[in-house]
Swiss-Prot record:
Residues that bear N-acetylmethionine: 1
Regions of compositional bias (Low complexity) in chain numbering: 98-113
Subunit structure: Component of the WASH core complex also described as WASH regulatory complex (SHRC) composed of WASHC1, WASHC2, WASHC3, WASHC4 and WASHC5. The WASH core complex associates via WASHC2 with the F-actin-capping protein dimer (formed by CAPZA1, CAPZA2 or CAPZA3 and CAPZB) in a transient or substoichiometric manner which was initially described as WASH complex.
Coiled coil (residue ranges): 46-74
Name of one Pfam family that matches: CCDC53
Residue numbers spanned by region Disordered: 94-126, 158-194
Compositional bias per record (Polar residues), positions renumbered to this chain: 114-126
Compartments in which it is found: Early endosome
One of the GO BP terms on file: endosomal transport
UniProt-recorded name of the protein: WASH complex subunit 3
InterPro entries assigned: WASHC3
Length: 194
């Protein structure tokens, strides 16, 4: 023992003389812990379930709104003949921010060269462009009207179309799709003639 009367080694208690822990008290503590843990987990699962239900409802509302918008746009007569020119300068300015000036000058030079090349190719071949294709024209019209591009991309993917062609309205329609579009347009023309 030191000068204060405290033991130098160990607790100084003879463990053989200490009474046993009361089992009822241990069981009560354990039961209280289990009850509180289960209540916490129940509250947590209820909150998670409520948030998931709210999110599911919002997704259904957005899907319904998108379907209504799609129906409204498809009911507009003459929408198939609309051609839309998307300016690459606007897209570059939005995506690159501070580098927009130098990039826009480069894209302007590239687009001038590309348009010159396309003008020389266009008369030599009768190519169906994205802007003239009725399947893509309605999506280009949606972009012009101001529908969010991500929603249009999702809709195009669901219909099996390439959403990258929204940015290139003067590009030729991919091979398989142009033949299908010509067949569909000829089928629709023949159905009107009957």
């Amino acid at each position: 023992m030191d000068e204060d009367g405290l033991p130098l080694m160990g607790s100084g208690i003879d463990l053989t003389k200490v009474p046993a822990i009361q089992q009822k008290r241990t069981v009560a503590f354990l039961n209280q812990f289990v009850v509180h843990t289960v209540q916490f987990l129940n509250r947590f699962s209820a909150v998670c379930e409520e948030k998931l239900a709210d999110l599911s409802l919002r997704i259904q509302q957005i899907e319904t709104t998108l379907n209504i918008l799609d129906a409204k746009l498809s009911s507009i007569p003459g929408l198939e003949d609309v051609t839309v020119e998307v300016s690459p300068l606007n897209v570059t300015a939005v995506t690159n921010g501070s580098h927009s000036e130098t990039t826009s000058e480069q894209t302007q030079q590239n687009s001038t060269q590309d348009s010159g090349a396309q003008e020389s190719e266009a008369p030599s071949e009768n190519v169906l462009t994205v802007a003239k294709d009725p399947r893509y024209a309605r999506y280009l019209k949606m972009v012009q009207v101001g529908v969010p591009v991500m929603a249009i991309r999702d809709k195009m993917i669901s219909e099996g179309l390439d959403p990258e062609l929204l940015e290139k309205p003067d590009a030729p329609v991919p091979n398989g799709e142009s033949e299908r579009a010509v067949e569909e347009s000829s089928d629709s023309d023949s159905s009107f003639s009957d």
